[in-house]
């Protein structure tokens, strides 16, 4: 066993040495801590801990659970200097990591960032460590990391009004659904500013703030203003007061190069662009900014003129690609379309090529779909992107097959593959859906094995366009609907949530980043009634990400079957699973407590867009002392 593990151990030591030498930020307080949503600023979600191995992971047991009192939990807990931080509902909690005992809590009175908090370690002026999170009133609050008290000398009595420094309709919605990121003494925010109707609202500017005072330091206009580069990609004045085009998901920091990478969403309205003809920069872009000044370094637009709600939903992941013996600093971006793009971190050049391919065009009056869309040459899409009604229906039972066939025939459904636009006279089916493919759960990266891991869905969506009889001011003339009179319909049985397409419905996928080839893929999740009939490799829809460890383990929840699992990073073999009280639509984390015990923690909140049974708990797992010593 020692000989088998030795190569990973040697590589791990070299990685740690190179990272420590390159980083101008303060070093981690404890090696076993998890200091940001992605553990490190580059969102690799990789842990160097080695106590839990392939040989003993089956012995993991629940050691504590903390009830947040809130449902639909999506946050990844942080553990820093002996405290765990997590959000739920309107509350930020600090817990004792060893036991789950509450140390303090801060109740904002309205919803806080549902995906957690950002941590700043303080600075040389003796300003103590702080936490930053959003509040649903459109504000960001700073808390003392030790006590949970509002830091009153930050902003206005501890708060920044994020609406006031953004031009546009200040009455529009604004929220930090995902936590900000921190570079040195700068807190960098994106935000959720409305994606539906009307099309106008607050701009989705990316901004940098002084971590001590809350002073605005810089802004990057995700919708260019008059005279700025990119404004020519908007027809006429359609850029004015345009909402959406925002970094609502996680951002990533390259500390060594002083870069922040931001994935942006689609411009409003999500499903009709007749009032915003053009490519619509910087919508649906991966943007690299100077983290100190906010100046644009480079960008790549991955969807032109989006009318599918195919935001870039996930944190860009910093990786290294080895080519001809040379290590290239790279950044990987998963999309809702399940395409995986890999770029040179410094220049933005695609490392495995990009092709502009013709795509179907819309026949909705006034719409002007872009004639081509970008596809990576490698790897291929990670999820289903086509559907053939002659052979791809799931014929599990006569009843299910009849339900899906009737749905198809009654609503005159059709598909032309990925990027099929919704029409007026029939209902389109396209794969993936607005849930992905990939989503905010994103990637984890194993720098030892040179692979990224992601959980994807093979779930289609159905929709058609409908002309509004009396559109509200600022609303587009056409809106998207479905057989269920919702803007988005899933291509599944509404009662059972079993998709109409053949399985697998959800998968865990590993990609070799040095060759951009799929290393392995396995079904992820089970439907209980199908499992009882012997169909236990169907996978399920899922939402919630992966982490990986130096011992070659991949941990993932996400599925609607309430399971939490561990897989072999090399082969994709499942090594462990447990059943939670609710599905875990969140990304796990792992840390080493003060007693030298490695724990794995996940939020099991259910609910969400997959309509899972709700839960309210943060759950921790560890090995027994006898298993740890084995």
Residue ranges and their predicted role:
Residues 23-50, 370-383, 388-399, 473, ...:
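N-terminal pre-domain segments of enzymes
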Residues 143, 203-215, 279-294, 344-347, ...:
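Beta-propeller blade signature
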Residues 43-126, 133-156, 160-163, 549:
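N-terminal cofactor/phosphate-binding cores enriched in small/glycine residues
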Residues 91, 97, 114-118, 122, ...:
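Hydrophobic or amphipathic alpha-helical targeting/insertion segments
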Residues 65-76, 105-126, 156-181, 221-250, ...:
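Extracytoplasmic beta-rich repeat domains
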Residues 31-38, 70-89, 112-139, 172-198, ...:
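Repeat-blade elements of multi-bladed beta-propeller folds
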